[in-house]
Structures are given as structure tokens and as C-alpha cells.
């Protein structure tokens, strides 16, 4: 953490609602110190009324911001521009000087490439239909996933995501649950890791979890139980943060160093 704030200190932060649990300030303030950057990262926990009242002011004074639930889509109308990926996905989680980016998308692409490479021939089941689900669905589609099935509590959001994916030339549909028998990739973008049935995990080649507290959720435990490859929520959180710092500073601390720091501080378990 920066020991002294002065005239030249740059402001960064996270915008969201009910986000006291977040690790983002620990990650970024550690990175700023490690990289020797005169900056501070704060949390802006805003209800909808506060968000609408102060978002323009935050965009004026902050050098860069991250955005989480429930504002990844809403924030776009306040920005001057968005990059190709966030425009297509219609969700932003990283802002730099009023420009929007989606580093959730970049993180999923990076991590899936490391785990299994090309997704050709895989059927992907995405649980949830919010901003994280959009990023995951687009990333997996761009890696070659043959079909995307959206599993969500309500059909309204699921239909919107399916239409968006199909409009961009991908093969998407709504499913009540996974019913394939092989070459499955399962993504949980909801706050509830138990939403994915165990029999679905058993048939998977790769499991992707967005929840990171605890790191070993029920979904990750089951993936380990059946010797399934997995990407946990901490990996996603850290990699998207690293990608955000590359946008802000064109440099970053390594994923491994950040994760080591979080465990050493007992901030994750």
C-alpha cells in the first residue's frame, strides 16, 4: 500500500454493489508498490442511486477503474469509447481514461489456452447470463467452441445472451442443463458453485469457476474428485487484474507473484 499520497498520486478503483469481500484493492495496491507506481486503488461500493449520481465524477478524476456486478453493462453508456471485444460482448470490466475494455474475456482466453488450447469440437455450458457469462461465452466461442449452451434461472437474460452470440455468428442456445456425454466445458459465472450438477462435472474436460472465496468451491472440489482440469476463480480474478494493469501501465506483476502474496497474507484459502 502506498505510504504517502501526494499531488501526483493517481486514483484507481473498483465500482460495484455489495463488494466488501473483494480482493481487488489488495491485488492492485500490491502491484503498484511492487512496480513503483505512485497510485492508490480504492473500492466504491455503490447502490444504483449513488452510481447514477457519481459515475461521471469518478470517470473524470480516476485514471482507471474496474467494474463488477451489477454495473458491467450499465457503465458503457457513460464511456467515450469501448474496444472491439467489449463492444461485441456489451460488457465492460476495465476502464482507462473513459475507454472501456473487457479483461474477463482476455483472462478466460489466456487461461483456457494454457489448459487445453484449441476448443474445436467442444460443447460449452455456461451457467448464468450476466457480464461474466458474456465474457466467457465469447472467449470460448472465439477459441473454437462448437456450441454454447446457456443455463440460467430466467429465460429473459438467457435469450438476450443467446441472441447476442448468434448475431455475432456463433452457435448458441438455451438449455435446462447439460445433456452431452463428452467434450464438455462447464463455466459457472453465478455466485452459487453448486448450481452445476455433479453428473455434468463428471463428463467435463474442463471446469471454469468464477467464484474465488473460497478458492476451492464445491465445483472445484468435484473437478478434483474426478480428475477434471479446472480454472478456479482466483486464477481468473488475478489474470484479469494483470490484463487491466497492462492496459493502464503497459506492464504488470506476474500472476504467480500476486497469488503468492494473497496466500501469504491469508487473504484467500
Curated annotation (Swiss-Prot):
This enzyme's EC code(s): 1.1.1.25
Annotated shikimate binding sites: 22-24, 68, 93, 104, 212
Catalytic class of the enzyme: oxidoreductase
Catalytic activity: shikimate + NADP(+) = 3-dehydroshikimate + NADPH + H(+)
Keyword terms: Amino-acid biosynthesis, Aromatic amino acid biosynthesis, NADP, Oxidoreductase
Residue pairs linked by disulfide bridges in the UniProt entry: none
Residues binding NADP(+), per UniProt: 128-132, 152-157, 210, 233
Pathway membership, UniProt: Metabolic intermediate biosynthesis; chorismate biosynthesis; chorismate from D-erythrose 4-phosphate and phosphoenolpyruvate: step 4/7
InterPro entries assigned: Aminoacid_DH-like_N_sf, NAD(P)-bd_dom_sf, Shikimate_DH-bd_N, Shikimate_DH_fam, Shikm_DH/Glu-tRNA_Rdtase
SUPFAM superfamilies associated with the record: Aminoacid dehydrogenase-like, N-terminal domain, NAD(P)-binding Rossmann-fold domains
Gene3D superfamilies per record: Leucine Dehydrogenase, chain A, domain 1 (3.40.50.10860), NAD(P)-binding Rossmann-like Domain (3.40.50.720)
Gene Ontology BP annotations: amino acid biosynthetic process; aromatic amino acid family biosynthetic process; chorismate biosynthetic process; shikimate metabolic process
A molecular function (GO) term: shikimate 3-dehydrogenase (NADP+) activity
Active-site residues, Swiss-Prot/TrEMBL: 72
Subunit structure and binding partners: Homodimer.
Function: Involved in the biosynthesis of the chorismate, which leads to the biosynthesis of aromatic amino acids. Catalyzes the reversible NADPH linked reduction of 3-dehydroshikimate (DHSA) to yield shikimate (SA).
Listed PANTHER family: BIFUNCTIONAL 3-DEHYDROQUINATE DEHYDRATASE_SHIKIMATE DEHYDROGENASE, CHLOROPLASTIC, SHIKIMATE DEHYDROGENASE
Family membership noted in the UniProt record: Belongs to the shikimate dehydrogenase family.
Name this protein carries in UniProt: Shikimate dehydrogenase (NADP(+))
Species annotation: Saccharolobus islandicus (strain Y.N.15.51 / Yellowstone #2)
Amino acid at each position: 500500500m502506498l505510504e504517502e499520497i501526494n499531488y501526483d498520486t493517481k486514483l484507481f478503483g473498483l465500482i460495484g454493489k455489495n463488494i466488501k469481500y473483494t480482493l481487488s484493492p489488495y491485488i492492485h495496491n500490491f502491484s503498484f508498490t511492487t512496480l513503483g507506481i505512485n497510485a492508490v486503488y480504492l473500492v466504491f461500493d455503490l447502490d444504483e442511486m449513488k452510481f447514477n449520481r457519481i459515475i461521471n465524477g469518478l470517470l473524470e478524476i480516476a485514471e482507471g477503474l474496474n467494474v463488477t456486478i451489477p454495473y458491467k453493462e450499465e457503465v458503457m453508456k457513460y464511456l467515450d469509447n469501448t474496444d472491439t471485444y467489449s463492444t461485441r460482448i456489451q460488457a465492460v470490466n476495465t476502464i482507462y481514461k473513459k475507454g472501456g475494455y473487457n479483461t474477463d474475456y482476455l483472462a478466460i482466453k489466456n487461461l483456457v489456452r494454457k489448459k487445453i488450447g484449441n476448443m474445436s469440437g467442444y460443447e460449452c455450458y455456461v451457467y448464468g447470463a450476466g457480464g461474466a457469462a458474456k465474457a466467457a461465452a465469447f472467449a470460448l466461442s472465439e477459441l473454437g467452441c462448437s456450441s454454447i449452451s446457456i443455463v440460467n434461472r430466467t429465460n429473459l437474460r438467457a435469450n438476450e445472451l443467446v441472441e447476442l452470440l448468434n448475431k455475432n455468428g456463433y452457435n448458441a442456445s438455451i438449455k435446462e442443463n447439460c445433456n452431452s456425454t463428452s467434450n464438455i466445458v462447464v463455466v459457472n459465472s453465478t455466485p452459487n458453485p453448486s448450481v452445476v450438477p455433479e453428473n455434468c462435472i463428471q463428463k467435463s474436460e474442463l471446469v471454469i469457476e468464477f467464484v474465488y472465496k473460497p478458492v476451492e468451491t464445491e465445483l472445484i472440489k468435484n473437478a478434483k474428485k474426478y480428475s477434471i482440469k479446472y480454472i478456479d476463480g482466483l486464477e481468473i480474478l488475478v489474470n484479469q487484474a494483470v490484463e487491466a494493469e497492462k492496459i493502464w501501465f503497459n506492464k504488470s506483476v506476474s500472476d504467480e507473484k500476486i497469488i503468492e502474496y494473497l496466500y501469504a497474507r491469508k487473504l484467500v484459502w
